[in-house]
């Protein structure tokens, strides 16, 4: 074994298996590209992105950690979101929640 080595079982690993997901159509109405990282609270992304924000409360992109989705000006694409897990407390980002998100997705 090499220090830091991760040994995984054979086969494919399914990310976020069994978690509820939401699909949203997202459009970039701005004049510059907008990139959103894998663990950014999607509800709080740049307001140049147009979508149903209430559905995104407490959610993040369903993509591998460390990756991102880029929206070019005028782009519209469908994204899949998964719930934030753990304590379901959201602090920072754009400061729109700064607290707990309850089971219904509403700020606490």
UniProtKB/Swiss-Prot annotation:
Pathway: Nitrogen metabolism; urea degradation; CO(2) and NH(3) from urea (urease route): step 1/1
Pfam families referenced in this protein's UniProt entry, alphabetically: Urease_beta
Catalytic activity: urea + 2 H2O + H(+) = hydrogencarbonate + 2 NH4(+)
Gene that encodes the chain: ureB
EC number: 3.5.1.5
HAMAP family linked: Urease_beta
GO molecular function: urease activity
SUPFAM superfamilies according to UniProt: Urease, beta-subunit
Signal peptide (residue range): none
Keywords: Cytoplasm, Hydrolase
Organism superkingdom: Bacteria
Protein location: Cytoplasm
Name the UniProt record assigns to this protein: Urease subunit beta
GO cellular component, one term: urease complex
Example GO BP: urea catabolic process
Chief place of localization: cytoplasm
Assembly description: Heterotrimer of UreA (gamma), UreB (beta) and UreC (alpha) subunits. Three heterotrimers associate to form the active enzyme.
Entry's family note: Belongs to the urease beta subunit family.
Native organism: Trichormus variabilis (strain ATCC 29413 / PCC 7937)
């Amino acid at each position: 074994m090499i220090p830091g080595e991760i040994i995984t079982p054979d086969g494919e690993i399914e990310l976020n298996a069994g978690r509820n997901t939401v699909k949203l159509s997202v459009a970039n109405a701005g004049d510059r590209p907008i990139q959103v990282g894998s663990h950014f609270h999607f509800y709080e992304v740049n307001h140049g992105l147009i979508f149903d924000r209430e559905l995104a409360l407490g959610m993040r992109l369903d993509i591998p950690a460390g990756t991102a989705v880029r929206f070019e000006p005028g782009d519209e694409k469908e994204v899949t979101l998964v719930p934030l897990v753990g304590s379901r407390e959201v602090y920072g980002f754009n400061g729109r929640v700064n607290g707990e998100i309850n089971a219904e997705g509403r700020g606490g």
